[in-house]
């Protein structure tokens, strides 16, 4: 038996004035079929009352306790862009930004610069006070930064004020340890050296000539020490894989040593190629015991406050699920359909509202739920669960769980 965890990123929502959500209003005959034939419930990925990030949510959905394994977003971003991170590294996500001569931020995204490969080379490989600087752009103005060396700490502040019109803040230690003081000093030096190198870089000289904003600074944030996480396959004694279009989810998969399946046209946006992702899933379950697939577009629509786009994208996912169900044997595969968090249109950000969930496959205890939405599935047999419960439930259903006790 195989298990699939199908994540519709940002799926859940809050009712509008008419009492509807994009999911409730969408035409979703396949999701409703799964609800009728499966066991339903509602879920909070991390915990009741906690609005999680996609990082902490996916750790929980993979069976890890985010309160003990999550150190910050930086390590997962760095891993996702292809940096071979090691336990003890200090990692950050970064923006290329535009600053003036006083390091006051003019634009946090450097005019949404498209190509930063040459700028990356100016920073990657630096040595500062015996610490190696690893830097990799991840498309456009985004990048990841890793500090590697002895006596480092993630107990430091960020180098990003998250707003414009203010200077790049001085990075400071958050405790009195020598490691934190040393790391803060090193990161401040990296920010200064990066500005010196980027400010006079030929790419930026050319941008100035063309009337474009220079990408002459970096803003590190999301600091975290790379955690030592038990590999997913070792933890569960199964072979697992991940399909996703976003670097963050890719990084989480790599961090827990799931095989990452690259899919052409998987963009992490509403224009992602759902057919290619579906085919990748169908191929993956031939050789893997467990596959997590993340589809991101609904979350993007939510962050933009676009109700109709979210509804339409959910309907596209329903057609994708129809294609998947038509090409698998229900007696051989369990599919868990849920989200990682709610992203209400009214809030344009993640919330703690629980998410609908259904587990579809043979021998599940089918309940009386007939539609898949935020208002129906809570009546189902799964009741109210947490993300960490999903993998153990699937291991039990697929006959791969070990008895606890004598």
Curated annotation (Swiss-Prot):
EC number, as in UniProt: 5.4.2.12
Chain intervals with Basic and acidic residues compositional bias: 156-165
SUPFAM superfamilies referenced in this protein's UniProt entry, alphabetically: Alkaline phosphatase-like (SSF53649)
Pathway of action: Carbohydrate degradation; glycolysis; pyruvate from D-glyceraldehyde 3-phosphate: step 3/5
GO MF assignments: metal ion binding; phosphoglycerate mutase activity
Record-linked HAMAP family: ApgM_A
Reactions that this protein is recorded to catalyse: (2R)-2-phosphoglycerate = (2R)-3-phosphoglycerate
Family the UniProt entry places it in: Belongs to the BPG-independent phosphoglycerate mutase family. A-PGAM subfamily.
Transmembrane segments: none
Keyword line: Glycolysis, Isomerase
This protein's name: 2,3-bisphosphoglycerate-independent phosphoglycerate mutase
Organism: Methanococcus aeolicus (strain ATCC BAA-1280 / DSM 17508 / OCM 812 / Nankai-3)
Role of this protein: Catalyzes the interconversion of 2-phosphoglycerate and 3-phosphoglycerate.
GO term, biological process aspect, one: glycolytic process
Region annotation (Disordered) ranges: 156-177
InterPro entries: Alkaline_phosphatase_core_sf, ApgAM_prokaryotes, Metalloenzyme, Pglycerate_mutase_ApgM, Pglycerate_mutase_ApgM_sf
Superkingdom assignment: Archaea
